[in-house]
Structure formats: structure tokens, C-alpha cells
């Protein structure tokens, strides 16, 4: 079945006040997410005197990112859709956002991450941990891991926030999105850092000027997000389906 509405968009759309407001919302949401996520890592390193990574540290990172993403998505949902992730490319592939609007969002997200990372360096007098592959982890497995984790994330976004058959599920969407990120961090954090989001890895990379295998944190999420968008659009959204009974939460 064909994808619904893949479109490039117009220059007028890219500069429309509503698009710019949505871009600002993405900037703020990404700032909030990176501040809590990366900030929690800095705080953990301070408390442990930059000690070795531990299961407790991984769990704390998972919780911090899950809570922060829940908030970041919630506060941006009514303005920009609360994407908070350049893997919004998956929404373009699925025909749910124009290419130009997606570019505006991505620029805003990257700027939000850079500004936040620079601010964290200033207020904590510490370096922002940059994403990198753990010792013994190859580039190929790392790429596949980021693809799979981001597929799960974007698929969750489609199922809970994009699918017109979702019914009225209220705040369940941002909760589910936060939960899948937290769960994926428990899986991939020890191997790649579990980025699933090019913006989250880009800001710390710029501020620390650390680019080792950085392309993995772009290619993995963009491929995984694109596949998720295609799969959900082709197999589920365009399929005839009787609306199930819904419950308000």
C-alpha cells in the first residue's frame, strides 16, 4: 500500500510563524531532555569521583532519561508534536511531516542539545560525557543495536501518538515513549550508551569535541526510525481496521 502523504513542503511553510514556534518548542523540549539526561550522568560521576560504570549508574541513567523524555514529549506535544529527536525522519518517511518542517525541527533539536551541553559544562565545571562505543564493541554490532533500539522507540511513537486508531489514550503516549527509552538504555547503555537520538549525542560531541564513531549515532537512529515509519504506515495505518473500544485514562 502506498505511503499516505510524503511531501517536501514549501519555503513558506519553513518560515511560517507556526513552524518557527514549533521549532522553538522542539528546542526547549530537547534542552529539557538533555539537561536531565546528561546532567544526571555528570552528577553520578561527581558522586563516584569518576569511578567505573556500575549497574546502579546504568539504572539511574535509565530512570532519568525515561522521566525527562516523558516531560519533554508532554510539554511539546500540543505545539510541535513533541518529537525531541531527529529520528523524526521516520515520521517524514511515513508521510506525517514534510521534509522542510522536519529539517526545522532537527536544527532546533541540535541547537537545543548544544546550548544545553555548553550550559552543563558551565554550571557543573565538569565535562559532558560524550557517547562512544564501549571497549570490545564493534562498529557493526553497535550500528545494529542503535537501529533496533530506535526502531522500538519510533514504533512506540507511531502506535501511541500517530496512529489515528489509537483512540483517546491521554498521557499514555509520552509515558510509553519514556518507558521504551528507559528500557532500551538498560539494554544498550553498556555497549553504545543507548543514544537512539542524534541530537542527544550531537551536543556533547560538539562541546567535548569528541567524534569517535559519531556517525553510528546518526546512521543507527535514522535508519531505525525510517524503517519503523515504513513498517507502521504500510502494515497498520493504511490497513482497514475496526476501531476497538477505548478507555479514557
UniProtKB/Swiss-Prot annotation:
Pfam families cross-referenced by the UniProt entry: MIP
Keyword check for Phosphoprotein: no
Residue intervals passing through the bilayer: 22-42, 56-76, 103-123, 137-157, 169-189, 217-237
Motif, NPA 2: chain positions: 197-199
Motif extent (NPA 1): 85-87
Any one GO MF annotation of this record: water channel activity
Compartment(s) of residence: Membrane
Top-level division of the source organism's lineage: Eukaryota
GO cellular component terms listed in the entry, alphabetical order: plant-type vacuole membrane
Tissue: Expression is highest in root tips, with slightly lower levels of hybridizing mRNA in stems, and whole roots, and much lower levels in nodules and leaves.
CDD domains the UniProt entry points to: MIP
Membrane topology: Multi-pass membrane protein
Keyword annotations of the record: Membrane, Repeat, Transmembrane, Transmembrane helix, Transport
Family: Belongs to the MIP/aquaporin (TC 1.A.8) family. TIP (TC 1.A.8.10) subfamily.
Domains as described in the record: Aquaporins contain two tandem repeats each containing three membrane-spanning domains and a pore-forming loop with the signature motif Asn-Pro-Ala (NPA).
Task of the protein: Aquaporins facilitate the transport of water and small neutral solutes across cell membranes.
Official protein name in the record: Probable aquaporin TIP-type
Species for this entry: Medicago sativa
Lineage: Eukaryota, Viridiplantae, Streptophyta, Embryophyta, Tracheophyta
Gene: MCP1
Amino acid at each position: 500500500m502506498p505511503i499516505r502523504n510524503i511531501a517536501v513542503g514549501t519555503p513558506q511553510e519553513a518560515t511560517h510563524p507556526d513552524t518557527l514556534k514549533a521549532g522553538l518548542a522542539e528546542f526547549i523540549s530537547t534542552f529539557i531532555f538533555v539537561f536531565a539526561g546528561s546532567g544526571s550522568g555528570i552528577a553520578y560521576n561527581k558522586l563516584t569521583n569518576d569511578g567505573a560504570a556500575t549497574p546502579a549508574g546504568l539504572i539511574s541513567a535509565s530512570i532519568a532519561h525515561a522521566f525527562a523524555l516523558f516531560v519533554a514529549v508532554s510539554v511539546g506535544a500540543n505545539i510541535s508534536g513533541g518529537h525531541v529527536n531527529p529520528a523524526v525522519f521516520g515520521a517524514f518517511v511515513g508521510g506525517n511531516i514534510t521534509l522542510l518542517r522536519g529539517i526545522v525541527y532537527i536544527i532546533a533539536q541540535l541547537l537545543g542539545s548544544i546550548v544545553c551541553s555548553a550550559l552543563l559544562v558551565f554550571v557543573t565545571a565538569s565535562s559532558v560525557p560524550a557517547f562512544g562505543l564501549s571497549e570490545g564493541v564493534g562498529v557493526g554490532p553497535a550500528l545494529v543495536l542503535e537501529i533496533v533500539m530506535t526502531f522500538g522507540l519510533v514504533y512506540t511513537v507511531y502506535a501511541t501518538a500517530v496512529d489515528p486508531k489509537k483512540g483517546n489514550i491521554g498521557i499514555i503516549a509520552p509515558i510509553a515513549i519514556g518507558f521504551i527509552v528507559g528500557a532500551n538504555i538498560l539494554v544498550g547503555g553498556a555497549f553504545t550508551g543507548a543514544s537512539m537520538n542524534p541530537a542527544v549525542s550531537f551536543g556533547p560531541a560538539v562541546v567535548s569535541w569528541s567524534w569517535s564513531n559519531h556517525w553510528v549515532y546518526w546512521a543507527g537512529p535514522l535508519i531505525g526510525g525510517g524503517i519503523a515509519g515504513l513498517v507502521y504506515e504500510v502494515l497498520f495505518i493504511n490497513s482497514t481496521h475496526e476501531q476497538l473500544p477505548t478507555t479514557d485514562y
